[in-house]
UniProtKB/Swiss-Prot annotation:
Macro domain location: 1-172
Name of the molecule in the record: Macro domain-containing protein in sno 5'region
Record lineage: Bacteria, Bacillati, Actinomycetota, Actinomycetes, Kitasatosporales
Annotated source species: Streptomyces nogalater
Gene3D superfamilies noted in UniProt: Leucine Aminopeptidase, subunit E, domain 1
Transmembrane segments: none
Similarity comment text for this entry: Belongs to the MacroD-type family.
Length: 181
C-alpha cells in the first residue's frame, strides 16, 4: 500500500525519485511550480522538454497526460510533467485532474520510482478550488494501483496543507510530516 505524506514547503527542495511538475502544455516553463522547477532544475530540463516538443508533442502535451525528463540539478532522478485542467464552473473537468495523478503514478511506476512528490495540481493560476483538488488528489492516489511506495504532497502554504490534512483525515489515512508549527 502506498503511504501518503504531507509536507508544507517548496517542492524544488524535496528529495524524491520523481518530482511532479504542474506544467503547461508547451512544456517550456512558466509561472508557479513550473517556473520554479525549470529555474532550480537548470537547462537540462528545458533541453529535454524542447526535444519532446520537437519529436512527440508538437502541439503540446495534452491535458491529463504526463511525460518524464531528467531532474537536472534537482534532488531527484526525474521530473514528471503533467498538464492539469483549468477550473470551469460550467464543465466538470475532474476526470482530467484525476488523470494527471493517475498518469503521473503510472509513469513513475514504469520508471521504477519509489517516492513521488506532487504539488496541488491546478490550484494556482488554473484556479481549481483547493478542497475539491485535495479530494480528487487523495482519492485518486488511494485508488490507483502503483508500485510507488510513498506519495508526498508538497504544499506551498498553510491553507493548502490544512486542506489536504483534512482530506487525509477524512479518508482515514492521516500521514503527516513537516508541518511548521
Amino acid at each position: 500500500m502506498t503511504t501518503i505524506t504531507l509536507v508544507q514547503g517548496d517542492i524544488t527542495r524535496q528529495h524524491a525519485d520523481a518530482l511532479v511538475n504542474a506544467a503547461n502544455s508547451s512544456l517550456l516553463g512558466g509561472g508557479g511550480v513550473d517556473g520554479a522547477i525549470h529555474r532550480r532544475g537548470g537547462p537540462a530540463i528545458l533541453a529535454e522538454c524542447r526535444a519532446l516538443r520537437a519529436s512527440r508533442y508538437g502541439e503540446g502535451l495534452p491535458t491529463g497526460r504526463a511525460v518524464a525528463t531528467t531532474a537536472g540539478d534537482l534532488d531527484a532522478r526525474w521530473v514528471i510533467h503533467t498538464v492539469g485542467p483549468v477550473w470551469s464552473s460550467t464543465e466538470d473537468r475532474s476526470d482530467l485532474l484525476a488523470s494527471c495523478y493517475r498518469e503521473s503514478l503510472r509513469l513513475a511506476g514504469e520508471l521504477g520510482a519509489r517516492t513521488v512528490a506532487f504539488p496541488a495540481l491546478s490550484t494556482g493560476v488554473y484556479r481549481w478550488p483547493m478542497g475539491d483538488a485535495a479530494r480528487i488528489a487523495v482519492e485518486t492516489v488511494r485508488t490507483t494501483p502503483t508500485a510507488v511506495e510513498e506519495v508526498r504532497f508538497v504544499l506551498f502554504d498553510t491553507h493548502a496543507y490544512d486542506t489536504f490534512a483534512r482530506e487525509l483525515g477524512d479518508a482515514g489515512h492521516a500521514g503527516h510530516a513537516g508541518h511548521p508549527g
